[in-house]
């Protein structure tokens, strides 16, 4: 219910309110009228139902009387049975004794056997039936009695009345009931059967009852009766013109005693109840359905709805007229009383408004403990039961503090801990009640919330401890695994640089491959653990996606060629020259996908396609390998999941590679998807946002514009990419089909030349070529399919055109022919582990550096004080003085030489700690020769510049 905002309204609003009240009164009168009409309708329905009940009682008496007759006849038949041979005993017979008529119910019914075996019993029973007919049959209105043998299934008919009976229909119905009785479950075989058959005339039928006759707990025969039924048997004379329909237990209409128009179709809801009274669908008729025990039949009485409404039609018209008159009178009176009633009420508006505001604030309070406290002294004026209980929990000091807070009106809530350790939060608002300043207080038991907050705090502390334990575990595992692995991989790297005897080189290579695989497994597990513990961070910086792709293809091209596969790398011209992201993690993801493609592909090729897709950089890796079943694609990115059928089981791995890829791409705000078909190959597509992308300027290369290249490329994808790339550079392309070329034309093929090319040059794209384009014969260049995007640079070289960095995104790679000379660099190696210390010294020696060694930080300071050291390469975790304190001490001494840390801890926090201590960089064990060479080259160049 909505309360009015204020009782002090204008007179105009008051008049509208009074009119609304008059309307409500009129609606109330209309409701009463409707209620009266409905009551009259219910009364009429009650009268009709009473007549229905009287008729149904008469029908019930008819059925019950027939059932009683059956019991009497059954008693007579059973008393005339003897246990001898299961036949009836003979009685004294007179000369007028007749044998009943026999009717076979089935084709194999043996009536002769029944007549001969039961002759005496049947004659005795026939004599009694005749006697019973002459003395009692008229009272029971029976047509005939029949006996059916249980063994021969032949019916002995004892006619009690001469009347036409439809023999075929009766025998058919009896045959059906006998079959139903014989097929019934054992617990139902002792029940009586009742049914009704339609007579030759409408409104007349025949009622049948069948009961079993037992002798010594054995079924001997079935005793049945036939009785005519008429309309007067089922409703009282002089009643309403109602329809009478008898239905079976399935709701099927058996007979209508008022003609075919009176048949009522039974509804399923009727059959669920023994007695049902109501209207049929569409409200066409009012019906009463009642069961007729002990039979399974039901009787349905019906009358048209027009007959029900006949008496209340005038009442409805009178009610409508009355409501019209009352409505007119009410609205007339409303206009008269508007000026006489509401003007005196304005003086009471202020009091009513305060009362209304008070009630609204009560309703606005929470449905908890509510009380009204007087502001002056804090006395409880009014409270509910829950508030009374809470107030009794407060101590005297709590009450005084609550009173002071209420009087001060500085805050509107207070938390109180009661004497029984119940946490109460008391909130209040100030108001007026009975001309006094009061505070409406709401008391809430927040003990559960306080306990929950404490539990959450404990859970947070437990989670923090678990995170710290996980970090410690990762650091320990990383250090303990990487330290010995460094000794293995490092020494194998050095061993491969030496000249080895025949056969030993193969063993060293196998050992190096196995150790590299072990390192990859350890790295995958540590990366996944760092991702799960949220310790792995994306380090965005500006990088060139083209350089990343060139580096990846250069690393994997030898492996692809060794497997006799093809690696096609298509970098679209619209790919940015630079963007912001983490190139190391992107390279890790693409390398993992490319490595999987190589492992699972034995025949065909692998395509690496890089292009722009809206605001994303799309990188697609497609192979022609074994493919992945559809049911396993959905689990492909689950941790430790490996495809478990066929060839895949032969490959090694932890099942973490794709899971790490998905998480890394997600951390870069990108996504990864897969499309695979078993036997056809797989396609992985990853997308990363184009943050800070700088696109190449669309500008043709001067000198290439107008040149013509003939294409004889069978690979459709390769051909389309070449056409797009050369069109951007202004080169005209045509499909070569044996035409005569011009002198400056160039032929581009992806297969060996069949004839000598008469043009300027021919470029052959070879799947097995590794490295930069080479001129293996005059005018014949071989080009790798892994660097198709560098074709314009080769054409510029053929046409002797100087490259413009703004026109082309990349140029041909050049080999560095200057050898490094590092013998001017003295490096101090600090490590407490003798194997690692010796290994680092050997690696530095193989790179041309001079080095000195120290056992720990203290020994390193001693070496620094006596020798001129250019670079310090120090382990982090050492006894006496670790790498952190050593670096801090070096910086305190004012030395600015580069300090590079070496740690077996793979956590990001460890590397950050190294940088914070003053180190210039940090390397993770195992440190390969390539990593060591690249890192030291940077700092060696810095030292040389400082010397200069």
Curated annotation (Swiss-Prot):
The chain crosses the membrane at residues 21-41, 314-334. Autophosphorylated. Activation probably requires a transfer of a phosphate group from a His in the transmitter domain to an Asp in the receiver domain. Residues 357-425 form the PAS domain. GO terms for biological process: regulation of DNA-templated transcription. Residues 1-20, 335-948 are cytoplasmic. Residues 705-805 form the ABL domain. Pfam families: HATPase_c (PF02518), HisKA (PF00512), RcsC (PF09456), Response_reg (PF00072). This is Sensor histidine kinase RcsC. It comes from Salmonella typhimurium (strain LT2 / SGSC1412 / ATCC 700720). The gene is rcsC.
């Amino acid at each position: 219910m909505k309360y009015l905002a204020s009782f002090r309204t204008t007179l105009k609003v008051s008049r509208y309110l009074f009119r609304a009240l008059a309307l409500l009164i009129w609606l109330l009168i209309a409701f009463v009228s409707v209620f009266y009409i409905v009551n009259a309708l219910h009364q009429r329905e009650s009268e009709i139902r009473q007549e229905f009940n009287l008729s149904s009682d008469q029908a019930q008496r008819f059925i019950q009387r027939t059932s009683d007759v059956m019991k009497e006849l059954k008693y007579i038949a059973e008393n005339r049975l003897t246990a001898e041979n299961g036949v009836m005993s003979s009685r004294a017979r007179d000369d007028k004794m007749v044998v009943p008529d026999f009717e076979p119910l089935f084709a194999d019914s043996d009536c002769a056997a029944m007549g001969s075996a039961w002759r005496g019993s049947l004659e005795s029973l026939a004599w009694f039936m005749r006697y019973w007919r002459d003395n009692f049959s008229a009272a029971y209105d029976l047509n005939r009695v029949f006996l059916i043998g249980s063994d021969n299934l032949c019916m002995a008919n004892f006619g009690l009345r001469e009347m036409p009976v439809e023999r075929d229909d009766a025998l058919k119905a009896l045959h059906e009931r006998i079959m139903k009785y014989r097929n019934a479950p054992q617990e139902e075989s002792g029940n009586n059967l009742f049914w009704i058959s339609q007579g030759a005339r409408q409104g007349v039928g025949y009622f049948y009852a069948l009961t079993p006759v037992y002798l010594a707990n054995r079924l001997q025969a079935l005793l049945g009766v036939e009785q005519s039924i008429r309309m007067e048997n089922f409703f009282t004379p002089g009643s309403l013109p109602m329809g009478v329909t008898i239905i079976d237990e399935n709701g099927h209409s058996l007979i209508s005693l008022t003609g075919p128009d009176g048949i009522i179709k039974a509804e399923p809801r009727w059959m669920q109840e023994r007695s049902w009274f109501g209207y049929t669908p569409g409200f066409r008729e009012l019906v009463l359905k009642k069961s007729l025990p002990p039979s399974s039949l039901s009787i349905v009485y019906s009358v048209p709805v027009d007959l029900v409404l006949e008496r209340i039609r005038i009442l409805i018209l009178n009610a409508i007229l009355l409501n019209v008159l009352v409505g007119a009178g009410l609205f007339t009176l409303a206009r008269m009383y508007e000026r006489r009633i509401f003007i005196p009420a304005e003086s009471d508006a202020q009091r009513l408004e305060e009362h209304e505001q008070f009630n609204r604030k009560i309703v606005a309070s929470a449905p908890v403990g509510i009380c009204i406290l007087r502001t002056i002294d804090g006395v409880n004026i009014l409270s509910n039961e829950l508030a009374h209980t809470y107030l009794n929990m407060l101590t005297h000091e709590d009450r005084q503090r609550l009173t002071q807070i209420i009087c001060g009106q500085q805050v509107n809530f207070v938390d109180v801990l009661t004497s029984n350790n119940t946490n109460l939060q008391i909130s209040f608002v100030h108001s007026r009640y009975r001309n006094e300043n009061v505070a409406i207080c709401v008391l809430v038991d927040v003990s559960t919330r306080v306990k929950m907050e404490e539990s959450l705090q404990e859970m947070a502390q437990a989670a923090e401890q678990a995170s710290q334990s996980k970090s410690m575990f990762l650091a320990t595992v990383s250090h303990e695994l990487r330290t010995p692995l460094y000794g293995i991989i490092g020494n194998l790297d050095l061993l491969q640089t030496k000249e080895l005897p025949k056969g030993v080189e193969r063993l060293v290579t196998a050992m190096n491959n196995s150790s590299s695989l072990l390192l990859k497994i350890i790295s995958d597990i540590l990366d996944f653990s760092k991702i799960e513990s949220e310790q792995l961070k994306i380090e965005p910086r500006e990088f060139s996606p083209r350089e990343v792709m060139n580096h990846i293809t250069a690393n994997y091209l030898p492996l692809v060629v060794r497997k006799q596969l093809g690696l096609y790398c298509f970098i679209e011209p619209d790919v940015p020259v630079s963007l912001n992201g983490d190139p190391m993690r992107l390279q890790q993801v693409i390398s993992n996908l490319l490595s999987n493609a190589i492992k699972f592909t034995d025949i065909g090729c692998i395509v690496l396609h890089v292009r722009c897709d809206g605001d994303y950089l799309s990188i697609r890796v497609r192979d022609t390998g074994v493919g992945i079943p559809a049911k396993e694609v959905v689990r492909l990115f689950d941790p430790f999941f490996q495809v478990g059928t066929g060839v895949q089981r032969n490959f090694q791995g932890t099942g973490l590679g794709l899971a790490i890829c998905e998480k890394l791409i997600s951390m870069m705000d990108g996504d990864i998807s897969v499309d695979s078909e078993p036997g056809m190959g797989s396609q992985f597509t990853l997308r990363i946002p184009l943050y800070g992308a700088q696109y190449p300027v669309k500008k043709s290369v001067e000198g290439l514009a107008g040149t013509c290249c003939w294409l004889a490329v069978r690979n459709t994808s390769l051909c389309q990419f070449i056409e797009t790339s050369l069109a951007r550079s202004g080169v005209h392309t045509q499909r070569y089909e044996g035409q005569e070329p011009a002198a400056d034309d160039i032929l581009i093929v992806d297969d060996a030349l069949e004839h000598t090319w008469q043009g300027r040059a021919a470029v052959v794209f070879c799947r097995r070529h590794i490295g930069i384009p080479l001129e293996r014969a005059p005018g014949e260049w071989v080009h790798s399919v892994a660097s198709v995007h560098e074709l314009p640079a080769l054409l510029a070289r053929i046409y002797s055109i100087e490259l413009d960095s703004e026109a082309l995104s990349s140029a041909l790679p050049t080999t560095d022919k200057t050898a490094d000379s590092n013998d001017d660099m003295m490096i101090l190696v600090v490590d407490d582990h003798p194997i690692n210390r010796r290994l680092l010294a050997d690696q530095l020696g193989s790179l041309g550096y001079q080095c000195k060694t120290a056992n720990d930080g203290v020994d390193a300071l001693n070496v620094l004080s006596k020798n001129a050291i250019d670079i310090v390469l120090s382990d982090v975790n050492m006894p006496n003085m670790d790498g952190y304190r050593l670096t801090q001490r070096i910086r305190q001494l004012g030395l600015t030489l580069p300090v590079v840390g070496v740690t077996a801890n793979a956590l990001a926090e460890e590397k950050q700690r190294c940088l914070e201590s003053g180190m210039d960089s940090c390397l993770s064990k195992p440190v390969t020769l390539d990593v060591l060479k690249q890192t030291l080259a940077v700092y060696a160049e810095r030292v040389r510049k400082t010397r200069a």
